[in-house]
Amino acid sequence: GVSKYSAVAIPACNGDQSVVPFAAGALDFDAAYVNLGTGAFVLRPTADALSAPPLLTSVIRMDGQDTDFVLEGSVNGAGAALDWYERHQGAAADRMLALLGDGELADEGAPFFLNGVAGLASPFWKPDFESRFVGDGTDLQLCRAVLESVAFLVKANLDEMDRHRPAPERLVASGGLAENRLLCRMLACLSGVPVDRGSDREATSRGLAFLVAGMPKDFEAPPVERFEPDADQRLLARYLKWLALMREASGS
């Protein structure tokens, strides 16, 4: 398009969230895109606009000829949940995450975190939900529970998407919180598919560059690190317990 005010060409106009799936080039309809920042979102490409409550349906690209739709899941408390942990526990989340490192996927003795930080979004939709721990633990276990809750909320949205689309063959992770290897491994375990994390964390900028360049076929994707799924039954069992607690607490 061209701005009527200055006759300056506008090659692309889009929201930051909508360009993330294009960071590695053309849209992969066999993938689900998970961006992990202050909040998180899950995008699952679809050929048509689907009505799939409690998920959202969004248009992420439209050029006058083609339209790309996605099912969208929203998680308000990702990095923000770690900020919540710091305020309420008085412990540095960065230090706790460093201590957790790239270790065990699950701690069966850890409490659960019912994560409604900044409002509980999909698939529960309870804006006034009170975030809280169920059970007691050390500062390290509490931090693990918060990190784990982010993975669990993503998993809950993926489960909803699987009711309307075939399960994805992989997850594509981006955003600042995706730098946490333990979280990426949790997502791989819970989803049962590999998680690909791009080496370039600026997914928004890369996605926009791809669209502005006219979606070139030779667009160079950044190298990825792949996290293969580890079928850790302890983490899967914790997810089911957490899901039951969330449903009870939210009245879902």
Where are these regions (language model features)?
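Active-site core segments that coordinate phosphate-bearing ligands/cofactors
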Residues: 2-174, 179-252
